Amino acid sequence: MRRVFADTSYWIALVNPRDQIHAKAVSVTQQISPVRILTSEMVLAEVLNSFSDGGPLRHAVGGMVQKLTSNRDVVIVPQTSEQFESALRRYEQAADKSWSLTDCASFQVMEAEKIQAALTHDQHFAQAGFETLLC
């Protein structure tokens, strides 16, 4: 089964029907199925934080993340101290880039798992040499 990494922009687009890439996220998901999706606790924290100011989507995103934890086709990579420190080193080394700490951690997960494609609209993934499925 093909494996892809899912970034923040993908999950936000799926849960928010008004998101500019919602239709594309839904369409690409259907096109690449069956697929095993890897994501990370850091990514999901970003997703939850993006809806923290309230409204109906806050409840929806909380429910989505809960469902992901029991979905056999989704692997959520836990945040470890070692991963955080390694991502921080990469973040510091990439001072010429506008990569976030979560981006750096995501790149490391993708490299460790030998995943080349990301469900993302974030050009930083292409800049780091990965295929972006939502661009």
Predicted regions and their residues:
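A general alpha-helix detector
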Residues: Y10-W11, E46-V47, S86
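Short, well-structured N-terminal submotif of metal-dependent ribonuclease cores
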Residues: M1-T39, D53-Q66
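Short amphipathic alpha-helical interaction patches enriched in hydrophobic/aromatic residues
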Residues: I12, L48-S52, R72-D73, Y91, ...
